[in-house]
Amino acid sequence: MGRTREFDEEAVLKGAMHIFRKHGYQGASIRDLEEATGLKGGSIYHAFGDKAGLFDAAFGHYNRTVLEGRIERFAPPGSGLQGLRELFLSLLHEPDNGSLGCLITNMAVEFGGGADPHPRVEAALGLLRTTFRLRLTEASIFARDADGTKANRTAIRLLAFYQGLLVLIRGGEDKAGLQQAIEDEFNQLETMS
């Protein structure tokens, strides 16, 4: 019978998530992770197997709490284009001013270029693309898109725009300009409806 965990798993995953967002996977040292989680290296390895196991758990926590939470809050089923607009605008109001960036975006860049994308990155981008497509089909013009081609193409374009916004926010781009770009994009989509 295994030992029960004697730590607050949510707090540990949140701390690790912060370090991976700040330093990336390669740049996150065990010492950084120890400080952020309050666990010693041996406890990290015992609980998660290795650094990759902790990363996977922290990334899963990020996808559940940050990504899915943001979608549920701003673009739930039935919210259509307005929900997507709100989802995009919400990116401009991060508590850390976007300085840590998005874990999904950061890891897509760090792990990119390999033969196989990281499964957590692939799943997160897939969730965004699917959410965009589903909210688009709630708009009248996309509802008439019998085979879904137009909604799929637009969802991919919005995914590229969303990820680009996250990079620009992390790079310190003027948020007023980014807000106007978001408004312009969704105003154009609404005129198509």
How should these model regions be labeled?
Residues 1-7, 140-147, 193:
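N-terminal intrinsically disordered/low-complexity leader segments
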Residues 11, 19-53, 57:
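Helix-turn-helix
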Residues 12-20, 91, 132, 162:
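Short hydrophobic clusters on alpha-helical segments that form packing/core surfaces
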Residues 57, 70-100, 151-158:
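Hydrophobic alpha-helical connector segments
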Residues 60-66:
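Short, basic, alpha-helical segments at the C-terminal edge of helix-turn-helix-like DNA-binding modules
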Residues 67, 82, 115-141, 153-156, ...:
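Amphipathic alpha-helical packing segments from all-alpha helical-bundle domains
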Residues 83, 96-119, 167:
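Amphipathic alpha-helical segments used for helix-helix packing
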Residues 94, 158-176, 188-193:
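Amphipathic C-terminal alpha-helical segment
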